[in-house]
């Protein structure tokens, strides 16, 4: 059920115990590292505790009441995930440890069965290492080639370059692209890219780790073939990821991990695999945290993803106006908030990002500094690292003001 009007952020903040913390002695926590992970509401914490306190059991196996209750709650989360991204069926939803494992599953299972020598896989310069390294491993193993779509100086992908790769006589075997950059905040026009790719018969993987938590994502409308994302970036626990795969593709893919629960029958020299999606979920899964993820989805649904996006746009516009007025600051990525999410990466003068993050921490402000697992993009930007502030539903304009005040103090301290 969607709330009416703008988000009541101060009411939302009451649901997050950690936001009552203080850093550096007496400084209220200003948490601006949401692109790395988000904080957890009480509903999620309580759902996990409830499992361990009241119906802790393995799933899909025993017939006793605890097992049946645990299985029911686990599978309820799969249903919630399918509805959240508008998947056709729960059979299209595979639980993994994280988005990284989800992309590796595609590379290992689909990739090793389909990619051949001299084939090409197309990715982009904005990718997280999770959407680079698996393809490097695969192309190296298969004698295939990895191609990169570049970005312009404003952080937009060069779509003509992308089109050229698709039109080349050496046809690409697969495209894998982030829906939203974890550094630039760029929202990639994946709908258009998927359509262009499908016109050439090329399947597309979408890394939705930064988009699914922040906006309404509809995999059927988007028509992607694969999508990966993580629970912990959308109020859920760590250790849970999701891989969505179109069923007609998933049915042809070999298993990723062998073991219990992904089988129907095992004999000395042969095995009959389980039905979808269990064929890809070998071993005891992260039951408690999958159940906690279900509570996180309920929480976001109660707010409404359109409201989440509206709040972040408003906050990002406010922050961009403030930060671009600070002397010596360079902001990376699009300045039009229609084209970017709630992520602002920046540098200020010659202050090292780690030094800046330390000063921020002294003011109670938690930001990220470093290469953000995107060293290919850092090379494109010609920097070793950046500082990054990223927003979510519980952040306020007052917190942005604290962040900017700390930034101004750093500027004065370093005489910029």
Report residues per predicted region.
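Pyridoxal 5′-phosphate
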Residues: 1-416
């Amino acid at each position: 059920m969607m709330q009416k009007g703008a988000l009541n952020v101060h009411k939302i903040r009451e649901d997050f115990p950690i936001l009552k913390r203080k850093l550096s002695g007496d400084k209220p926590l200003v948490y601006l590292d949401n692109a790395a992970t988000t904080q957890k509401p009480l509903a999620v914490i309580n759902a996990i505790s409830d499992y361990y306190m009241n119906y802790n059991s393995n799933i899909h196996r025993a017939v006793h009441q605890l097992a049946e209750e645990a299985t029911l709650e686990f599978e309820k989360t799969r249903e919630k995930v399918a509805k959240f991204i508008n998947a056709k069926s729960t059979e299209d939803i595979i639980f993994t440890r994280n988005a990284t494992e989800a992309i590796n599953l595609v590379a290992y299972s689909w990739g090793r069965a389909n990619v051949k020598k001299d084939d090409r896989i197309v990715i982009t310069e904005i990718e997280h290492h999770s959407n680079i390294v698996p393809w490097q491993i695969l192309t190296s193993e298969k004698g295939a080639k990895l191609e990169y779509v570049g970005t312009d100086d404003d952080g937009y992908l060069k779509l003509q370059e992308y089109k050229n790769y698709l039109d080349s006589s050496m046809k690409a075997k697969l495209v894998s692209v982030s829906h939203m950059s974890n550094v630039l905040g760029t929202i990639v026009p994946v709908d258009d890219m998927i359509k262009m790719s499908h016109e050439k018969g090329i399947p597309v993987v979408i890394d939705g780790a930064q988009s699914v938590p922040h906006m309404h994502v509809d995999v059927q409308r988007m028509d992607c073939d694969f999508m990966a994302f993580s629970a912990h970036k959308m109020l859920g626990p760590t250790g849970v990821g999701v891989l969505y795969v179109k069923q007609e593709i998933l049915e042809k893919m070999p298993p990723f991990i062998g073991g219990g629960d992904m089988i129907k029958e095992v004999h000395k020299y042969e095995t009959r695999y389980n039905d979808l999606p269990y064929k890809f979920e070998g071993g005891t899964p992260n039951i408690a945290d999958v159940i906690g993820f279900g509570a996180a989805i309920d929480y976001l649904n109660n707010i409404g993803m359109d409201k989440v996006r509206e709040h972040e746009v408003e906050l990002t516009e406010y922050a961009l106006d403030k930060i671009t007025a600070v002397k010596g600051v360079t902001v990376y990525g699009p300045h039009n908030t229609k084209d970017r999410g709630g992520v602002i990466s920046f540098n200020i003068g010659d202050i090292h990002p780690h030094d800046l993050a330390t000063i921020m921490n002294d003011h109670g402000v938690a930001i990220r500094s470093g290469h953000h697992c995107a060293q290919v993009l850092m090379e494109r930007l010609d920097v070793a690292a950046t500082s990054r502030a990223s927003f979510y539903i519980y952040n306020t304009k007052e917190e942005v003001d604290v962040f900017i005040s700390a930034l101004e103090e750093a500027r004065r301290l370093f005489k910029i």
